[in-house]
Structures are given as C-alpha cells and as structure tokens.
Amino acid sequence: MSVLQVLHIPDERLRKVAKPVEEVNAEIQRIVDDMFETMYAEEGIGLAATQVDIHQRIIVIDVSENRDERLVLINPELLEKSGETGIEEGCLSIPEQRALVPRAEKVKIRALDRDGKPFELEAEGLLAICIQHEMDHLVGKLFMDYLSPLKQQRIRQKVEKLDRLKARA
C-alpha cells in the first residue's frame, strides 16, 4: 500500500466527473487500499478517488473513533434523502478550512463493496454527511461551492498561501 498525493484547490482535476467502475478487480482493490492508507495518513474521515487524481466512482470512509470501521463505496447511488442538518465541514483538498454546509440528515444509498458485491445502506448523522460530501467530489463539487463567492475567494486565497508556505519549507 502507498500514500497517494491529495490534490488541493485550485487544481482543476478536482472538478472532473468520475466515471463508473466497470469491474471490481485487483487493481480497484489496490486503489481502495491506497486510498484508505492516504486517508488515515492525512487524518481524514473520507476520501473520494477524484481527490487523488483517479477519476473513478470510488469512496472510502471511516468515521469511527478507533479508525477500524472501513466503508467502501464503489459506484454509489443516492436512493433517498431526508431531513436537514449541517456541520462545519473540512476537506483534505481544502486544507485547514472549514465551513457550515447544508446537508440531508439521513441518506439511503446503493453501492458495491471492495469485493464488488452490491449493498444498500441507510446512514444518518456524521456518516450521512460524509457520504454526501464524498459523493459531491465524484461530480466535481466541493463543499465551498455551497458558500458565497466572497467566502469561496477567501478560502482559495488561504489555501494557496498555505501551499506556498509548505512549498518553501
């Protein structure tokens, strides 16, 4: 397994729409494993393949405190959503920035697991929010897209400054 490079805004590759996975095979499983390693290394709770420049419909999530409840979503589809909620969301592609984003409180999805087996899942709370956040990535949407143009500009400037400082270090 290896840690992959996470793309940061304003990288336009984050805006690409991911293509469906045609077959869950050893290559896809390796990508899933690398994505988990990357997510844990970056201290995230979710990661979409788009964020690591792989434009396939793959998401990994682990919202557990002990980091031992891996959830793999390949070709996820949103079946139902209900309620309204929101928390201050962060994103590995938008480092050190957070914003309140409106989300559905509960979701029902269908996806394939790491072995290519179909399943349905009903989620609420943090897991539901994380699923929606990561599914947005698969269509090229970022949490900051829900914000005003002024807030988006401020976030972009802060991230670009942070990346410049890290490049010098």
Swiss-Prot record:
Among Gene3D superfamilies, the record links this protein to:
Peptide deformylase
Coiled-coil stretches noted in the UniProt entry, renumbered to this chain: none
User: Which cofactors is this protein said to need?
Assistant: Fe(2+)
What InterPro entries does its record include?
A: Peptide_deformylase (IPR023635), Peptide_deformylase_sf (IPR036821)
**Annotated Gene Ontology MF terms?**
metal ion binding; peptide deformylase activity
Any keyword Repeat?
no
The UniProt catalytic activity note for this protein reads:
N-terminal N-formyl-L-methionyl-[peptide] + H2O = N-terminal L-methionyl-[peptide] + formate
Catalytic residues as annotated in Swiss-Prot or TrEMBL: 134
Look up the EC number in the record and give it: 3.5.1.88
Q: Which residues bind Fe cation?
A: 91, 133, 137
Q: How is the cofactor bound?
A: Binds 1 Fe(2+) ion.
Give any single GO term for biological process: translation
For this UniProt record, give its keywords in alphabetical order, as a comma-separated list.
Answer: Hydrolase, Iron, Metal-binding, Protein biosynthesis
Q: Which family does it belong to?
A: Belongs to the polypeptide deformylase family.
Q: Which HAMAP family match?
A: Pep_deformylase
Please describe what this protein does. Removes the formyl group from the N-terminal Met of newly synthesized proteins. Requires at least a dipeptide for an efficient rate of reaction. N-terminal L-methionine is a prerequisite for activity but the enzyme has broad specificity at other positions.
Protein name in UniProt: Peptide deformylase
Task: State the species of origin.
Answer: Shigella sonnei (strain Ss046)
